[in-house]
Amino acid sequence: MSPPAEIQADTLKRFIAGWGGWTMESFFATLSDDFTQKPLPLSCGEPARGREQLYPLLSSLMTMMTNFKLTIHNTIHDPSNKAAVVYAVADGDTPFGPYHNEQAVFIWFNSKGDKVDRIEELFDTAFMAEFKPKFKKWALENPGAAAGRPPPANTST
């Protein structure tokens, strides 16, 4: 049986607010302990990441990017499948130019509906083909930006 739609809807709202808040704490607040993130399309060849692998990547990205703005264009919530989809555009400033990434994020909730268990993110491949090499170079030159470990998932909401 699926958790109540209201619980999932609240978790979705908190996930989007955390993403838009653009801090490590706000982003990780709704993620379960066994959370995974899979970059799409599959042709990009990026592996799925758990909390431990995602943390340094996001830490670097959040350290490097300023003036982050998330614009949500569409949200679809399917409570019976414990899932949602968000179409958004993320904008910001980086040391090597503007960041403008269209994304479709597929979200799955845990059995209680109070945490996000998995996301699959479909990125703008044209933008990412240009951005990723610049970001990887910056991350190698700024290794301290990826410091730390993710906080444990808090099971209370």
Swiss-Prot record:
EC number: 1.-.-.-
Record SUPFAM superfamilies: NTF2-like
UniProt keywords, alphabetically: Monooxygenase, Oxidoreductase
Class in the EC hierarchy, top level: oxidoreductase
Associated pathway: Secondary metabolite biosynthesis
Database matches in InterPro entries: Fungal_Meroterpenoid_Isomerase, NTF2-like_dom_sf
GO molecular function: monooxygenase activity
Family: Belongs to the avfA family.
Annotated function: Monooxygenase; part of the ergochrome gene cluster responsible for the typical purple-black color of the ergot sclerotia. The ergochrome gene cluster produces several ergot pigments including the yellow ergochrome secalonic acid and its derivatives, as well as the red anthraquinones endocrocin and clavorubin. The pathway begins with the synthesis of atrochrysone thioester by the polyketide synthase (PKS) CPUR_05437. The atrochrysone carboxyl ACP thioesterase CPUR_05436 then breaks the thioester bond and releases the atrochrysone carboxylic acid from CPUR_05437.
Name of protein: Monooxygenase CPUR_05417
Species of origin: Claviceps purpurea (strain 20.1) (Ergot fungus)
